């Protein structure tokens, strides 16, 4: 390693985030930041990529990267195999956290809350607009289970293709969406000297409380 990890750092130079810029609820600010990220971030960064953290039945945390596929006044939506590891975690502990990081904008958003399944109709609507290969893959892959090499997965895909030779695949019952209902949303804006801006929204009854956190 040519550079010590202790010496690896970058300076943050963009404008800060003030309470005057923060609306009464976090969704409007997320929409604004997300729109700016879509315009600004370039490959390999995907603006809707996020880290999803879940906790299993033994209290052990697990993280992975996946894509945000829906956002409305209720919450943040993603889709997956309900029988996957994350699906099993959410069945045992229906709380999760998301983190978005947009390096060009020097911004991060952390979201925490309860997770619920979306309706079968909503899952099917999204499933039908996915590429054919992805729709077949949702049937073929026993997600998170141990398999005997890549060949087994390719054999499963071939069998699935044959199954749906004469018909379009429909949404499997074991596949669909989850919606995270936010209880806490923190907006982080990088600032000089590591004195970052952190504005935190938290639910209190039917209202959102806005607070500034020390960096």
Curated annotation (Swiss-Prot):
Which BP terms does GO give this entry? pyridoxine biosynthetic process
Keywords, ordered alphabetically: Flavoprotein, FMN, Oxidoreductase, Pyridoxine biosynthesis
- Alphabetical list of Gene3D superfamilies matching this protein: Electron Transport, Fmn-binding Protein, Chain A
Binding positions (FMN) = 64-69, 79-80, 86, 108, 143-144, 188, 198
What is the catalytic activity of this protein?
pyridoxamine 5'-phosphate + O2 + H2O = pyridoxal 5'-phosphate + H2O2 + NH4(+); pyridoxine 5'-phosphate + O2 = pyridoxal 5'-phosphate + H2O2
Q: What cofactor does its activity depend on? A: FMN
For this protein, the Enzyme Commission number is: 1.4.3.5
> A Gene Ontology molecular-function term?
FMN binding
For whether the record's keyword set contains Chloroplast, the answer is: no
Per UniProt, substrate binds at 9-12, 69, 126, 130, 134, 194-196
Q: Does the keyword DNA repair apply?
A: no
The record's cofactor note says: Binds 1 FMN per subunit.
Q: Which residues cross the membrane?
A: none
Pathway-wise, it operates in:
Cofactor metabolism; pyridoxal 5'-phosphate salvage; pyridoxal 5'-phosphate from pyridoxamine 5'-phosphate: step 1/1; Cofactor metabolism; pyridoxal 5'-phosphate salvage; pyridoxal 5'-phosphate from pyridoxine 5'-phosphate: step 1/1
Q: How does it assemble?
A: Homodimer.
Q: What does this protein do?
A: Catalyzes the oxidation of either pyridoxine 5'-phosphate (PNP) or pyridoxamine 5'-phosphate (PMP) into pyridoxal 5'-phosphate (PLP).
**Family statement:** Belongs to the pyridoxamine 5'-phosphate oxidase family.
Q: Any idea what this protein is called?
A: Pyridoxine/pyridoxamine 5'-phosphate oxidase
Q: Which organism is it from?
A: Pseudomonas fluorescens (strain Pf0-1)
Gene name of the encoded protein: pdxH
């Amino acid at each position: 390693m040519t550079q010590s990890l202790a010496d690896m750092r970058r300076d943050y130079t963009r404008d800060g985030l003030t309470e005057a810029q923060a609306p009464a609820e976090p969704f409007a600010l997320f929409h604004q930041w997300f729109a700016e990220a879509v315009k600004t971030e370039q490959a390999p960064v995907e603006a809707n990529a996020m880290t999803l953290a879940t906790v299993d039945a033994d209290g052990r945390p697990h993280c992975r990267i996946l894509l945000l596929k829906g956002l409305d006044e209720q919450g943040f939506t993603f889709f997956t195999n309900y029988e996957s590891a994350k699906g099993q975690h959410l069945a045992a502990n229906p709380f999760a956290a998301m983190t978005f990081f947009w390096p060009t904008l020097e911004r991060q958003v952390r979201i925490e809350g309860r997770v619920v399944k979306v309706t079968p109709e909503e899952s099917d609507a999204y499933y039908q607009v996915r590429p054919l290969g992805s729709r077949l893959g949702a049937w073929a892959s026993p997600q998170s289970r141990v398999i005997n090499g890549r060949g087994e997965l390719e054999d499963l895909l071939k069998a699935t293709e044959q199954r749906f030779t004469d018909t379009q695949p429909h949404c499997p019952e074991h596949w669909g969406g989850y919606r995270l209902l936010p209880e806490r949303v923190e907006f982080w804006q990088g600032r000089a000297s590591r004195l970052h801006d952190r504005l935190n929204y938290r639910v209190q009854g039917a209202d959102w409380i806005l607070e500034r956190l020390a960096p």
